[in-house]
Amino acid sequence: MEQEDFYFPDTDLDLSFTSTTTDRTFASSSARTSLTLSFNDRLSTSSAVTTSSTSSSSVNHRRHDPHWSAIKSAKLLSSDGNIHLRHLKLIRHLGTGNLGRVFLCNLRDSSARFALKVIDRNCLTTEKKLSQVETEAEILSLLDHPFLPTLYARIDESHYTCLLIDYAPNGDLHSLLRKQPGNRLPIQPVRFFAAEVLVALEYLHAMGIVYRDLKPENVLLREDGHVMLSDFDLCFKSDVVPTFKSRRYRRSSSSPSLRRRRSGCFSVAAEKKYEREEIVSEFAAEPVTAFSRSCVGTHEYLAPELVSGNGHGSGVDWWAFGIFLYELLYGTTPFKGESKEQTLRNIVSTTKTASFHMDGDLDEARDLIEKLLVKDPRKRLGCARGAQDIKRHPFFDGIKWPLIRHYKPPEEVRGLVIKKSTRPHASHVIAVSPRRRKSFLWRALSYLLRGKSSSGGSKNQSNSNYYHYVGKSYASRKRV
C-alpha cells in the first residue's frame, strides 16, 4: 500500500531540499550501493546543459500513453513550449541513488504521476560523476521498450538536472524480496521476472548499451506487475553489428501432451523430457567488441574480469544475470563474504564456486546459473550470441517470447499489488493448443448443425454446451 501523499511547498528554482551534502557518500534507499573506480579509461568531457522534452513520436510503443497527453497539454500552456519545474508538484520522496534523489510528482491540473530524478551538479565532486549524468540522460532518451523507462522531459534549471520518467508504484524487486519467506521467491515468479529482465537486457545490448548495474534494487515494478529497469548512469555504449542466421540445434523439451497439462508457461511440473532437432532463424545483436576498464557496479554482482581490471565487455551483464537469478531463488548472492574485500576475493578465486541446495525439479535453474557464472567470459553463456542463447535454455522452455509483455504477472507474491486490467493475458490465450481449439470448433459446428434439425431449445442447449467445453478447457489450464 502506498504511503500517504504529502506535498512540498511550491518552488520553481529552489530545490535545496533535494540536495545531498558533498562531505559524505550519497545515501541509498537500497541495501547495496554501486561503486565507481577507474583503470585509466577515457572520460567523456561532454557537459552541455539543455532543456529538452522527448517527443512522443519517437516513442512508438508509448505514443498512446495518457502520460504523453498530459505532457503535451502542459507544453501547449508553456510560453516556450517546454516543461519546467513550475509545471510539476512534488508529492513525496521515493529514494536516493548514487547521483541524486527521486521524487514522486504530478503535473499541475493533472492526475498523471511521474518520477522526478533530481541531480544537484554542485554536489558531484568529480568529472566522472558529471559524465554519468549525461550518460544516463542520453541513454534514457534513446529507450523505447515496455520494460525500460520513458524519458518524458529533461529539465535543467540553475545547477539542477531533473529527469522526468515513469513512476513504478510497486517499488523495487529488492524490497519485494524482503517481504517473502526466506527473502526468496518461488520458481514461477522467478521465471517471470527473469524472462522480462532478459528481454530488457537483450534490447539494451541490441542498442550497443552495456548495463553494468543489474541487481534487484534496480528492477522496479510497474502498477501492472511488469518490470522496469532503472539507473543507467553506469552504462557505456559500444558499436554493435546485428546478424541474422539460420542454425541447427538440439533442444531438450517436454512432450506436447504433458506440456498441455501445465498450469501456465511459468509453472514447473515433473515432465518427461525428450530431444528434438530444430532449424531456426535467429536475430542477434550482441556488442561483442564492447570494452571498458572502469570498475563500476555493486560488489556482489561484479564479474571476475571487471574486478581484475583487465578490461571487460557485455559479458558482465550475463554474469550479473546469473547472480540475479541466484538471489531471487536463495535470498542471497553466491559469493558474498564477511566483507566487501572478501566478496571480491571470492569472485576472482578460481576455486570458489556457487553452492546449490535445490530440489530435484529445479535442476534447470541450477544448470542455467552455472553456465552464466563461468568465470572465463569466453565460455560464459550469452557472451557469443547474447540473449538468444539464454532464451533457448530449458529453464525458459514454453515461453512465447513475442507475447512476453502480455503474460499475467504472478499473483502469489506477497506485497505485489497488481492493477487489474481488462486486457487478456497470454497465459490464458496460449493455454489451449491449436489442435484442441480446432477440435472444439468442429464439435461446436456439429452441435449447431444438429440444432437446425431440432427445436430452438436444442439449439440453445448446443450453444451452451459449446461454451461449456471451451470454458472448461480454459478453466482447467488457468494458472492458480
Swiss-Prot record:
Chemical reaction(s) catalysed: L-seryl-[protein] + ATP = O-phospho-L-seryl-[protein] + ADP + H(+); L-threonyl-[protein] + ATP = O-phospho-L-threonyl-[protein] + ADP + H(+)
Disulfide feature: none
GO biological process, one term: cotyledon development
Disrupted-gene phenotype: Enhanced root waving when grown on agar plates.
One Gene Ontology MF term: protein serine kinase activity
Keywords: ATP-binding, Auxin signaling pathway, Cytoplasm, Developmental protein, Growth regulation, Kinase, Nucleotide-binding, Serine/threonine-protein kinase, Transferase
Localization (cell): Cytoplasm, Cytosol
Enzyme Commission number, as recorded: 2.7.11.1
PROSITE patterns, sorted: PROTEIN_KINASE_DOM, PROTEIN_KINASE_ST
Keyword Zinc carried by entry: no
Binding site for ATP: 94-102, 117
CDD domains xrefs: STKc_phototropin_like
Residue span, Protein kinase domain: 88-396
GO CC annotations on file: cytosol
Catalytic site positions: 213
Main location: cytoplasm
Keyword flag Transmembrane helix: no
Tissue: Expressed in root tips, lateral root primordia and emerging true leaf primordia.
Domain of life: Eukaryota
Comment field (misc): Over-expression of WAG1 induces a basal-to-apical shift in PIN1, PIN2 and PIN4 localization, resulting in the loss of auxin gradients and strong defects in embryo and seedling roots.
Family from the record: Belongs to the protein kinase superfamily. Ser/Thr protein kinase family.
Biological function: Serine/threonine-protein kinase involved in the regulation of auxin signaling. Acts as a positive regulator of cellular auxin efflux and regulates organ development by enhancing PIN-mediated polar auxin transport. Phosphorylates conserved serine residues in the PIN auxin efflux carriers. Phosphorylation of PIN proteins is required and sufficient for apical-basal PIN polarity that enables directional intercellular auxin fluxes, which mediate differential growth, tissue patterning and organogenesis. Acts as a suppressor of root waving.
Protein name according to UniProt: Serine/threonine-protein kinase WAG2
Species annotation: Arabidopsis thaliana
Taxonomic lineage of the native organism: Eukaryota, Viridiplantae, Streptophyta, Embryophyta, Tracheophyta
Primary gene name: WAG2
